Regions:
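Divalent metal-cofactor coordination and adjacent catalytic microenvironments
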Residues: 1-168
């Protein structure tokens, strides 16, 4: 499964190569998960991370070309220091966040619904369940969200409220 990290490519499926992710993780304290993974799993996690980032984030600016497969590179974007970002690069914070997210995806399926998440309380007598509107799992780890601050709007999982449970 070859990875295609061609900038603005029509069939690109990752923002970074395995080599770029390896370089990022070489400076990371918790590197064992990444270094223990096979190249195939690294590629899969990078592709999945890229896809999920594009699904969960409305990036600042506009796609540079209509033909590019991914949402980056983008036009009309400034970095956190207000410098214009070139339309022929993937900014380093996006690359680093992709690598970080890919490592998290190797550890667990962050797209799965965690059991019990969102439940505020459960009463056994006459059965009562109260759901929390704020206790919902997010696909993007907090560190990845922090790394991407200022690069777009992050959309979390749909929030939910309470439902009526009827005992039969």
């Amino acid at each position: 499964m070859a990875i295609d990290a061609t900038i603005a490519g029509t069939s690109s499926d990752s923002y970074i190569t395995v080599a770029t992710a390896d370089a990022y993780h070489a400076t990371h304290l918790y590197v064992t998960t990444w270094t223990a993974a096979t190249t195939d799993n690294k590629e899969r996690s990078l592709k999945m991370a890229t896809r999920l980032l594009d699904e969960r984030i409305t990036w600042t600016g506009t796609k540079n070309t209509d033909a590019q497969a991914l949402r980056w590179p983008r036009a009309s974007v400034t970095d956190n220091d207000l410098y214009s970002v070139s339309v022929d690069i993937i900014p380093e914070p996006i690359q680093n966040a992709t690598a970080e997210f890919a490592r998290h995806l190797l550890v667990s399926d962050l797209t799965a619904q965690p059991e019990g998440k969102g439940i505020e309380s459960v009463d056994a007598g006459s059965v009562s369940i109260k759901f929390s509107k704020t206790d919902t799992a997010d696909v993007l780890p907090a560190i990845v969200q922090e790394m991407l601050r200022g690069w777009g709007t992050i959309h979390s999982r749909a929030k939910f409220g309470s439902v009526t449970v009827v005992r039969t």
